[in-house]
């Protein structure tokens, strides 16, 4: 008997991750793509069978498909998963396929309220669950500031509108090499001020406002303050933010379970000392009550119960191995000897973020395909 098969948009699968619901995923991409990057959740089971192995039918895998769990078929763009889900439906299984495939999954954003700020202000985190990117929006008295926006610019603009806020400031904590920034485009569309660390902007081909320590930015007519903290190490210009004396937006310098990598501009040996100084001196001198909000997460276990990613600085100094290496030489070896593979198309991404090249939307999607690779564990 033929059963239903339907398309699920990424938001439905996203909710299963946040709600820790069970899901069985049949991933029909090739083995290398699957092992490199897949949809992960607390109670997700996977079966990877390349689509080309299923062209003659699904009979050989039927006994591996559970009947007591929701089944989602996944491929790169959608087409292959539609065909496989149709075959499984014909064989009597109720399944669904991921609309848009992994390309759509990599672009989905989930907004999560992190907390309240002074005088009615709010802090939001945008979780790009398929890529591990984290962006932020500070809203106060009808104004909004965005930090480390991804290229899905209309999502941020529409979100601010929905909150009745005008975007007045857009920041990038550093020149990104793992994903395409939406900061400059958002600023152009909304007439907001675009801020970028000048030491990361020496080759950019557009106008920007230099983001420098000592120049605090006030959001709204209230007392919400964004305080830049020069924190090199991931890049030479990396700059963190203290927001409302509550939150430390650490960019790609410090994550929940890992630390930033210093090599995406080919400068690992030169910048590892800056990375250590930022983590072991600059951050050590900050209030341990600050909640660290990074620009990436590595694993699903880093998500809090409400779906946000963030932990108190004191907890990270206690639990994060990268913050607890007393010997400087050992730290240097940890960083330079354990560098993960470079992000996909990272040099093209850097050039895009400098304004040197302007790839079309489809090319931008291709450039970003793959997992987060900004951390050292």
Curated annotation (Swiss-Prot):
InterPro entries: Metallo-B-lactamas, Mito_Persulfide_Diox, POD-like_MBL-fold, Rhodanese-like_dom, Rhodanese-like_dom_sf, RibonucZ/Hydroxyglut_hydro. It comes from the Bacteria. GO terms for molecular function: sulfur dioxygenase activity. Residues 19-114 form the Rhodanese domain. SUPFAM superfamilies: Metallo-hydrolase/oxidoreductase, Rhodanese/Cell cycle control phosphatase. GO terms for biological process: glutathione metabolic process; hydrogen sulfide metabolic process. CDD domains: POD-like_MBL-fold (cd07724). Disulfide bonds: none annotated. The active site is at 75 (cysteine persulfide intermediate). Pfam families: Lactamase_B, Rhodanese. This is Uncharacterized protein YrkH. It comes from Bacillus subtilis (strain 168).
């Amino acid at each position: 008997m033929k059963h239903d098969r339907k398309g699920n948009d990424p938001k439905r699968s996203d909710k299963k991750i946040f709600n820790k619901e069970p899901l069985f995923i049949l991933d029909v991409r090739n083995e290398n793509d699957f092992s490199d990057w897949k949809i992960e959740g607390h109670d997700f089971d996977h079966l990877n069978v390349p689509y080309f192995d299923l062209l003659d039918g699904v009979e050989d895998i039927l006994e591996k498909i559970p009947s007591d769990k929701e089944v989602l078929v996944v491929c790169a763009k959608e087409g292959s998963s539609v065909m496989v889900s149709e075959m499984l439906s014909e064989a009597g299984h109720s399944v669904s396929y991921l609309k848009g495939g992994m390309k759509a999954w990599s672009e989905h954003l989930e907004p999560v309220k992190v907390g309240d700020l002074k005088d009615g202000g709010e802090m939001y985190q945008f979780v790009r669950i398929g890529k591990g990117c984290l962006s932020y929006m500070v809203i106060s008295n009808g104004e909004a500031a965005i930090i480390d926006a991804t290229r899905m610019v209309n999502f941020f603009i529409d979100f601010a509108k929905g909150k009745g806020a005008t975007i007045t400031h857009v920041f990038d904590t550093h020149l990104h090499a793992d994903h395409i920034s939406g900061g400059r485009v958002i600023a152009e569309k909304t007439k907001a001020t675009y801020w970028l660390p000048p030491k990361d902007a020496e080759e950019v081909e557009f106008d920007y406002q230099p983001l420098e320590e000592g120049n605090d930015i006030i959001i709204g007519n209230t007392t919400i303050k964004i305080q830049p903290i020069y924190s090199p190490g991931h890049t030479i210009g990396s700059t963190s933010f203290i927001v409302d004396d509550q939150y430390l937006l650490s960019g790609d310098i410090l994550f929940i379970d890992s630390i930033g990598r210093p090599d995406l501009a080919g400068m690992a040996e030169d910048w590892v000392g800056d990375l250590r100084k930022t983590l072991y001196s600059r951050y050590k001198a900050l209030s341990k009550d600050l909640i660290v909000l990074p620009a990436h997460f590595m694993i699903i276990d880093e998500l809090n119960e409400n779906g946000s990613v963030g932990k108190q600085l004191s907890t990270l100094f206690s639990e994060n191995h990268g913050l607890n290496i007393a010997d400087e030489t050992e730290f240097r070896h940890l960083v330079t000897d354990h560098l993960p593979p470079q992000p996909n198309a990272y040099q093209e991404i850097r050039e895009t973020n400098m304004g040197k090249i302007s790839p079309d939307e489809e090319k931008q999607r291709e450039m970003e395909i793959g997992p987060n690779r900004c951390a050292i564990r």
